[in-house]
Design a protein with these regions (language model features):
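Gly/Thr-rich phosphate-binding beta-strand-loop-beta motif of the actin/hexokinase/Hsp70
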Residues: 1-29, 124, 128-159, 210-214
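Conserved phosphate-binding loops in N-terminal lobes of ATP-dependent enzymes
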Residues: 2-101
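Hydrophobic residues in beta-strands and at strand termini
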Residues: 37-39, 138, 161
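Helical "lid/coupling" subdomains associated with nucleotide-phosphate turnover
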Residues: 45-69, 84-96, 102-132, 147-149, ...
Length: 307
C-alpha cells in the first residue's frame, strides 16, 4: 500500500483524503475533498430514536460516488472509513454502513465517543508544538474536549451536541435574544458538570471543527493572509474571536453569507458552533485560541500506521 484513502463521515459533511505513506508512522496528505451533506439533519428535531433521513443518506452516498471517481485514478491504495456522532447515534446506521460497503468495499468503523476524543488528541500532539492545552472539537453532532498536560492525555469527554444539532434545537439561523439565552443556559449546564475543566484555566484552547475553521478563514481574510485555508497553528486572541462572534450576532443569515471568508453552507450554524467556544473562553480565562486542521481523521491515520 502506497496510498491510504480515508473516508470521514461527519454530522455536517463527508470528507475524504488521499495520504501517501512516507515511512513508519509518517504520511503526507496529497489530496483532500469535502462535501456538505448534513448527515445529522433532522436527527435533533424528534424525541426518542434518532434516525438518518433518506435524503441525508442519499446526499452522502452521492458524495462518496464522486470521491470514488477521484481515488480510483490512483494506484496501490487502500480505502478505510470512519464515522462519528451522527452515525454512532442513529438506530438505522446499518443501512448507511451496508450501502457504503457495497459502493466502496470499505466497512465503516464507527468511532466510539472515547476514540473520537483520543484521535483528536493524537492528531494535535503529532502536528502542533503544544504540550499543555485544552482541545475542543465542535462537530455537527457532538463536541469533544481533551485535556493535555506535558503532552499526555489526562481526561476527555464527548458531549452529544454539535453545531448542527444545536442550530436545529435553538433555531440558530435566526437567533433571537431568547434563543441565545436558552442556548447559553443549556451549554453552561453541560460544562458545569465537567469539574476537571478548571484544570484547563489559562491554557491555550485548540479549536477543531468546521465552524471554527470558518472563523479562522474570516480572520485570515481580514488580515489578507494567503492562503486563507492554510490555518494550521494559526493563533487568534480571545478578544478577536469575541469580536467576530459579536459581529455575526448582529447579522441575519443572508448577511452572514456575505461575510468575506464565510462558507455559505455554514452561515446558518456558525453561531451555534461559536457559542460553546465563547462560553469556555469566558469560563477558563483563556487568552488565545489555536486552530488545528488535524482532527480525528488524522489521529485515526496515526493509530493505523502505528499498528
Amino acid at each position: 500500500m502506497d496510498n491510504l484513502v480515508v473516508l470521514d463521515f461527519g454530522s455536517n459533511s463527508v470528507r475524504f483524503s488521499i495520504n501517501q505513506i512516507t515511512g513508519k508512522n509518517t504520511f503526507k496528505e496529497i489530496l483532500r475533498r469535502k462535501a456538505t451533506t448534513r448527515l445529522a439533519e433532522g436527527m435533533g428535531l424528534t424525541a426518542g430514536e434518532k434516525r438518518l433521513t433518506p435524503a441525508a443518506i442519499k446526499r452522502t452516498l452521492a458524495a462518496v460516488a464522486d470521491f470514488k471517481k477521484i481515488y480510483q485514478q490512483y494506484s496501490n491504495y487502500q480505502v478505510v472509513g470512519i464515522a462519528t456522532a451522527a452515525v454512532r447515534e442513529a438506530v438505522n446506521r446499518k443501512s448507511l454502513i451496508d450501502q457504503v460497503y457495497q459502493q466502496t468495499g470499505c466497512r465503516l468503523q464507527v468511532l466510539s465517543a472515547h476514540e473520537e476524543t483520543y484521535f483528536d488528541y493524537l492528531a494535535v500532539m503529532n502536528s502542533l508544538l503544544l504540550k499543555d492545552c485544552l482541545i475542543f472539537d465542535i462537530g455537527g453532532g457532538s463536541c469533544e474536549l481533551a485535556l493535555v498536560k506535558s503532552g499526555k492525555f489526562q481526561t476527555g469527554v464527548s458531549l452529544p451536541f454539535g453545531a448542527v444539532s444545536l442550530g436545529e434545537k435553538f433555531t440558530a439561523a435566526n437567533l433571537t435574544a431568547a434563543k441565545l439565552f436558552a442556548l447559553q443556559t443549556f451549554l453552561r449546564k453541560q460544562f458545569s458538570a465537567l469539574f476537571w475543566l478548571q484544570q484547563a484555566s489559562d491554557l491555550p484552547l485548540v479549536l477543531l471543527g468546521g465552524c471554527n475553521r470558518s472563523v479562522a478563514r474570516i480572520k485570515r481574510t481580514e488580515l489578507k493572509l494567503q492562503p486563507i485555508d492554510s490555518f494550521h497553528g494559526f493563533k487568534m486572541t480571545t478578544k478577536d474571536f469575541t469580536e467576530i462572534y459579536q459581529r455575526l450576532l448582529g447579522l441575519d443569515n443572508q448577511q452572514r453569507k456575505q461575510v468575506p471568508g464565510m462558507e455559505a453552507m455554514r452561515s446558518d450554524i456558525i453561531l451555534a458552533g461559536m457559542t460553546p467556544v465563547i462560553l469556555l473562553l469566558q469560563q477558563l480565562h483563556c487568552s488565545q485560541v489555536v486552530f488545528s486542521e488535524s482532527g480525528a481523521r488524522e489521529g485515526f491515520i496515526y493509530q493505523q500506521l502505528s499498528q
